[in-house]
């Protein structure tokens, strides 16, 4: 395959999956000598997507827009990005994301299901494919396209570098509460069903508080996190930072 100048990475999963794509993106950027790399992600993961280095454009898919008008969103993506990329890489095996990979890239790579009843047509039309392995860490799954492209890599995660401004902001906040060493406790998730129950969370926080180590509770300003913020118990070693820090400041 000729060296691609424009690449799009498709990740229709959660924040963690987007975050753990940075090693793949870093390897592609270095091996192909600074190509344009764009992302297509779910709109609720765009905050983490913006922190990944070497990304030029970020396009989003919205499940809300899908409910409002089933086909308009797909039509808009198709019209604006059809065969715009030399290479598309899709990190999930869903029908929609594979369709995007086929439509957006002249050459396409995608994860597919082990079940041939679901993946047979994908294997016919994709340039390359690999089987998504649920028993492997998501980072290792995300690096599989590099094997197909014969790009050497290490099984390590390339951390996201926070800006100097974000670093100074969080140092200022820690100085204000006279905290140097601490434990980060992040009680939230993107979806309610993934959140640790309130009663068990409070028991865990009470146990952590008894250790005498400062505990920073982190979270965003969204509806789920704002509800949790009100439920966090007050204790001498607990600092409720929910809604007071940016995602970048976590790094």
For the regions a protein language model found, what residue spans apply to each?
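Catalytic machinery of carbohydrate-active enzymes
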Residues: 1-251
